């Protein structure tokens, strides 16, 4: 694609822009992701407390996303990002030095507040500072750094997986490093030009826009772009003056269509199961039959690396295929991979290892009546004990029998007196018999490869499309006068459904089985594919001022291409700029407005 002169940008400056503005998300996931395994083990939390500690971050992120729109509109995108970085640092350090579960809980709640602010402010900041031809790529880079954070977090978890005492402290403490870096470096970036224009600070806005454009760009081209931005802001201000309430926003069909599409994108992203896959990847891998916990952690790092690598494929495709085609093709692949993932778990359940031995023939407990491993681990009070070593010859008769076949096993009651993963009696009663394996949540399976293949394919298809596109499209489709509010609303939907899916995953696996849960996610993804085929417009190669007029059409016609959308093609930039007393002598060498 040829570059328009007005869209030419200093690659080094924009590189600094997105590196500094998205490093936060590496931090975000580093604190959210696998350290929870080890920190929860350290504090020996009850099941209820575990759910609270895991979910409180998402809950506070959801709540803070409601106020993020007001704060970014009132105080600016830059200041909110700086505040989020500072708060994130405090939360990370609190978790690292936590000596009670309540301090850990408070630290995760504080981090959630920062995440909610940043997840709204950062994409909007990038979209408002970037030129048209690479806006989608830069906003998508934001999501790429989320996947980078997941990858780094998985590597860190693997490195510290053998340290069950203090390893989790290092994982959580390291999360403060990227937020400190962002707090320092982001200080030197200017505020969003569009926000400055909206506040009437035209000189500072022109300086900021100049700093985001290539040093040799013809000044007239920058002035033309600035005039387009200014006229859009003036129109938005008039709309704002006539639309002081949420009722006015709701009564605006164009805004409501855009908000519907934006929120739907966020909802489908979550109900397609992405954060279930990422939060519980190591657990899913264990549930597929991988027995060693350390191996499961490293395999989860492999899945995170696939997510990270292929998210960068989206950077290439977003400006070539466009947002619409990339989203639809990504969802189609997600549906196929979810079917494979669900089928793998279903085959594993159908062929679940039998309960071959009962060490206490007179025992008539619930556990003794279980017929296979799947029934056993589905119970809240039982676990499955089997041999990892297939060699016989052990002096213990039952152990010898178990060792003749990896898929022989016995169902035993859990030990209610301890949080340690041992049975209450008989085999697996303690950790001294290293040949015996004890599981309360998964079963050994010969179909592990199928589940892992589905998991890898899921990330292969999700990462380039449904990962970044909801954030990219939401940063583009709202008019300036309501952008902060609408983006805040769509972000709130994202975090709410993130929380809902994460909280219900284990419940769904109990009610529907794990493969039933993934079939349900497949159904949601299919519904999303159908809806987006009709409701999702293409925003590629359109300015933010042009995009809002896409939604003049009814929802069912949004997928159709339209031409000549812009009301700004014939803007007399010289008149518009000079009327607002913008100093024409301002050049790219102007000092930075922090």
Regions picked out by a protein language model, each given a short descriptive name:
Residues 212-224:
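Short intracellular "coupling" helices and adjacent cytoplasmic loop segments at the cytosolic face
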Residues 1-212, 234-594:
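Alpha-helical transmembrane bundle of multi-pass membrane proteins
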């Amino acid at each position: 694609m040829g570059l328009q002169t007005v869209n030419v940008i200093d690659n080094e400056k924009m590189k600094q822009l997105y590196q500094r503005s998205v490093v936060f998300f590496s931090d975000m996931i580093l604190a959210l992701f696998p350290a929870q395994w080890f920190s929860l083990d350290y504090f020996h939390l009850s099941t209820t407390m575990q759910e609270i500690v895991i979910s409180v971050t998402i809950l506070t992120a959801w709540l803070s996303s409601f106020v993020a729109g007001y704060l970014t509109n009132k105080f600016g995108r830059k200041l909110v990002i700086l505040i989020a970085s500072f708060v994130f640092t405090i939360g990370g350090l609190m978790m690292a030095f936590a000596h009670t579960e309540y301090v850990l809980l408070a630290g995760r709640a504080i981090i959630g507040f920062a995440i909610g602010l940043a997840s709204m402010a950062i994409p909007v900041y990038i979209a408002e500072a970037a030129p048209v031809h690479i806006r989608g790529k830069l906003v998508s880079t934001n999501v790429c750094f989320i996947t980078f954070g997941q990858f780094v977090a998985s590597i860190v978890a693997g490195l510290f997986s053998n340290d069950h005492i203090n390893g989790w402290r290092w994982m959580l403490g390291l999360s403060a490093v990227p937020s400190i870096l962002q707090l320092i470096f982001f200080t030197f970036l200017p505020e969003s030009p569009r926000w400055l224009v909206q506040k009437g600070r035209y000189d500072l806005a022109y300086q900021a826009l100049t700093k985001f454009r290539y040093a040799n760009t013809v000044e007239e081209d920058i002035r033309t772009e600035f005039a387009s931005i200014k006229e859009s802001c003036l129109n938005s201000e008039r709309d704002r003056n006539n639309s002081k309430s949420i009722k006015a926003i709701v009564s605006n069909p164009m805004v409501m269509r855009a908000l519907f599409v934006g929120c739907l994108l966020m909802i489908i992203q979550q109900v397609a199961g992405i954060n279930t896959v990422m939060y519980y990847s190591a657990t899913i891998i264990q549930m597929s039959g991988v027995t060693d916990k350390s191996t499961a952690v490293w395999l989860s790092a492999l899945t995170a690396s696939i997510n990270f690598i292929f998210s960068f494929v989206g950077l290439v495709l977003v400006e070539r295929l466009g947002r619409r085609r990339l989203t639809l093709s990504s969802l189609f692949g997600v549906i196929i991979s979810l079917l494979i993932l669900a089928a793998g778990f279903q085959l594993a359940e159908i062929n679940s290892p039998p309960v071959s031995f009962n060490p206490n023939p007179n025992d008539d407990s619930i556990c003794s009546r279980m017929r296979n491993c799947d029934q056993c681990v589905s119970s809240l009070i039982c676990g499955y004990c089997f041999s990892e070593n297939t060699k016989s010859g052990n002096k213990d008769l039952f152990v010898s029998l178990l060792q003749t076949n990896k898929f022989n096993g016995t169902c035993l009651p859990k030990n209610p007196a301890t949080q340690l993963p041992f049975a209450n009696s008989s085999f697996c009663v303690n950790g001294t018999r290293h040949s015996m394996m004890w599981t309360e949540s998964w079963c050994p399976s010969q179909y592990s490869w199928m589940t892992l293949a589905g998991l890898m394919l899921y990330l292969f298809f999700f990462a380039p499309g449904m990962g970044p596109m909801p954030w990219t499209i939401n940063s583009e489709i709202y008019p300036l006068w309501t952008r902060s509010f609408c983006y805040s609303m769509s972000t709130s939907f994202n975090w709410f459904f993130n929380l809902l899916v994460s909280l219900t995953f284990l419940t769904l696996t109990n009610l529907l089985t794990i493969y039933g849960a993934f079939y349900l996610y497949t159904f949601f993804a299919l519904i999303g594919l159908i809806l987006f085929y009709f409701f999702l417009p293409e925003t590629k190669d359109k300015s933010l001022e042009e995009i809002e007029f896409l939604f003049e059409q009814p929802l069912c016609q949004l997928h159709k291409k339209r031409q000549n959308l812009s009301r700004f093609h014939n803007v007399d930039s010289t008149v518009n700029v000079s009327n607002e007393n913008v100093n024409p002598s301002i050049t790219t060498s102007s000092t930075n407005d922090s």
